[in-house]
Amino acid sequence: LMYHAIHVMAPGEEANANLIVDPTTFESHLKALQEAGYYAVSPEEAYKILTENVLPQGKKVVWLTFDDSLWDFYDIAYPLLKQYQMQATNNVITGTVGQEANLSLEEMKEMKEHGISLQGHTVTHPPLATIEASLQQTELADSKTYLDSNLSQDTISFAYPSGSYSEETMAIAEQNNYKMALTTNEGLASAADGLLSLNRVRVLPYMTAEMLLQTIATP
């Protein structure tokens, strides 16, 4: 699942309306997922499932991803995720860490101890398919280095900014030891699509919990 912002939309935010999910709606999603028996996976667990096709304890699984490392993830989404005991992944634009509208390194370190994974979303959020290879290399390498060193981890996944990528981008991702890359292509993730071009279901503001469960139900 792909989320971005979780907050009550303020006046003047209409242009980004499709990226903003109301906290009440978000909580209804978590409650419905929990009641339907979904287990929220970490990137490492997602990778294992996609490569070995083995589900943990035979459960239904969902991967909750949030793009752009926005302030409200810590203030609003994170407490709800903890309340419902759901793991989640935030894809971090490393060049924005510590800015007022974004997560700080301290917040990320705290959340990492409580079931939140911080993965890549480049340094400056450029549409990768439109920039030259050397710049793509810098964006993918530097963001991974930042997360690896500051969070003492091996960053294995990232999301393409604005869903922009090419065959060249995927090759550069592989060279930089990313095991998975997330697109904005609509659909359920499957290894058949390639681990560096995984689909996601975009969560829109008007999606009720019932709609969400229908969208992710597998035959």
Residue ranges and their predicted role:
Residues 1-64, 71-72, 129-219:
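C-terminal active-site subregion of NodB/CE4 polysaccharide deacetylases
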Residues 1-2, 22, 39-43, 82, ...:
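Short, well-structured secondary-structure segments
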Residues 64, 93-96, 126-129:
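Surface-exposed cleft-lining segments at the edges of enzyme active sites
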Residues 70-71, 124:
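Short, glycine/acidic-enriched loop or turn micro-motifs at the edges of active sites
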